[in-house]
């Protein structure tokens, strides 16, 4: 009888030791639900860049500019994911400022003084986005890294993006920040909102309100009307709330460092 009891105790101890952290399975399932949103947004960016290539071939500068702007939306919504999971592709696709390739190299050609000959850069951008979309079918969407991505992007929107904008030549820096904020809201809602609400309803309400404030800060008609100080404060508050929430849902506090797990 004692042997059975000791065996049972040992089995119970091992089960507790080897089991996933509380909330790990629901978070993993929520991250999987987010995958399709990423595929859709990167697919939209890819479709936009293919339209851009068609307009360049037709020597349609106005159409090419419009396609470039449209392609940015899906990309910017996905930045919760891109820099932390695929940093090399992120640099090929969206390095800034003063990039000679990717979105911003093409921006300099279309909206700057270099004319319409951006076909080589556009071919490369199509290839990189197609590569990324293919990888999205199987890449491991670790919830910790996605939480890091939300915190990092929120901090960036309130920091260097607010300090002058990312897409200055095209005049669409505000569009970038709006899409970033929408991407943050989407990722938080799909992946983390339910888990935080279960762990701490009061904290969940505060985090959701902080996400909404970030979106409201950039839903303005013109970048000149941006209250940069308020945006910075609101972005930092959101990061702080995410850091408070993380251990309550079985994760480490999110880090702002690139390449963190």
Predicted ranges, named:
Residues 1-9:
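Bacterial N-terminal signal peptides that target proteins for export
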Residues 25-261:
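Mature extracytoplasmic or organellar-lumen-exposed domains after removal of signal/transit peptides
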Residues 20-24:
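Sec/Tat signal peptide C-region and signal peptidase I cleavage site
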Residues 8-19:
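Bacterial N-terminal signal peptides
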